[in-house]
Each structure stands twice: as structure tokens, then as C-alpha cells.
Design a protein with these regions (language model features):
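Long, contiguous binding/interaction regions
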Residues: 2-41, 48, 52-81
Length: 81
């Protein structure tokens, strides 16, 4: 199984990297860009687990290591390979 994990700054947290990217896009005349949030994308391959077990393990990994829950949110998708 493949878990696709997305980690992003919480809405209330200032995102200086996202702001810098948005400013650069504006300077390149992409005026339609309203906002950019910079995050992380991870792929975690799992074996030997049921779908339910995989969801539980990825949730645990995100809460314990992959995301800083004070300043980041996460979501994930589990895909069969």
C-alpha cells in the first residue's frame, strides 16, 4: 500500500515561505495568485497491513513524527498498489 501524506501550516500560522513564493509569482506577473501555502508531501509504502491498519498506523506516524501538531495540519490518502 502507498500512503500519500500532506502536511501544511495551520491557517492561523504565518507562512513566510508561502508568502515569498506568492510575492515572486506576482513579480512574474501571475497577478491571479491570491495566496500560497507551502507544505510537505510524503509517500510512505506499507506492507503486511489491512487498509484499516494502514490508516491507523499512518495516523499515528503523522501525530508522532511527520507533522508538528502545534503549527501543522495533516491529511493522507491510502492507495492500493
Amino acid at each position: 500500500m502507498l500512503a500519500k501524506v500532506y502536511v501544511t501550516p495551520k491557517k492561523a500560522i504565518l507562512d513566510p515561505q508561502g508568502k515569498a513564493i506568492a510575492n515572486s509569482l506576482h513579480s512574474l506577473h501571475y497577478d491571479e495568485v491570491a495566496d500560497v501555502r507551502m507544505g510537505k508531501y510524503l509517500e510512505v509504502r506499507l506492507h503486511g497491513l489491512s487498509r484499516n491498519q494502514a490508516e491507523q498506523r499512518i495516523e499515528e506516524m503523522c501525530r508522532r513524527l511527520l507533522a508538528n501538531l502545534v503549527i501543522e495540519d495533516f491529511r493522507f490518502e491510502i492507495m492500493e498498489e
